[in-house]
Amino acid sequence: MDKVLNREESMELMDLLGLERAAWGNLPLMRKAYLRKCKEFHPDKGGDEDKMKRMNTLYKKMEQDVKVAHQPDFGTWSSSEVCADFPLCPDTLYCKEWPICSKKPSVHCPCMLCQLRLRHLNRKFLRKEPLVWIDCYCIDCFTQWFGLDLTEETLQWWVQIIGETPFRDLKL
């Protein structure tokens, strides 16, 4: 995510979206803020045309570069389809056993917490550069990117974002 826009552009986009810079990388939150600001900045609604153009340029560039950073499309999945199939409930798909899965991933555990952590370990072994949030969706990259401790509340935030993320982008 840190390679999508340069630092100045990312800070400008977050300011235009009215979000804290710490929220950079929370794509569902950024999308909601973008749609809200489109209504506010729209010239037909009495908004600032220059801000609207600049926000559109930066957001579309960020959105396009995130798509390019992910795997090529091999089907069309929307986040609403994934969320409908799997409810946002950490004790089912996302985290099978909270205290155990949070400490060490198991190859035998089917939950996303363990599977994404194992995927992170495999990819980390094969790459020279470090993995970061959006390049990797594991909870460790999430906590490191946002500067959070690994708690049940953090798990809930991570689950919310993973639930809104298209499955193909998780690179499982």
Swiss-Prot record:
The keyword Transcription regulation applies. GO terms for molecular function: zinc ion binding. It is found in: Host cytoplasm; Host nucleus. Its main location: host cell. One of its GO terms (cellular component) is host cell cytoplasm. Signal peptide: none annotated. A zinc finger (C4-type) spans 101-114. Residues 12-75 form the J domain. Keywords: Acetylation, Activator, Early protein, Host cytoplasm, Host nucleus, Host-virus interaction, Metal-binding, Oncogene, Phosphoprotein, Transcription, Transcription regulation, Zinc, Zinc-finger. The keyword Ribonucleoprotein does not apply. The common region of ST and LT proteins comprises the J domain. This domain is essential for multiple viral activities, including virion assembly, viral DNA replication, transformation and transcriptional activation. This domain is also required for cyclin A-transactivating activity of ST. The strain Dunlop sequence is shown. Interacts with host PPP2R1A; the interaction inhibits PP2A activity. Promotes efficient viral genome replication by accelerating both G1 and S phase progression of the cell cycle. Inhibits host PP2A by binding to the A subunit, thereby displacing lower affinity regulatory B subunit. Inactivation of PP2A in turn results in the transactivation of cyclin A and cyclin D1 promoters. Late during the infection cycle, ST may induce dephosphorylation of host MTOR, leading to the inhibition of cap-dependent translation. May establish and maintain high levels of viral genomes during persistent infection in cell culture. This is Small t antigen.
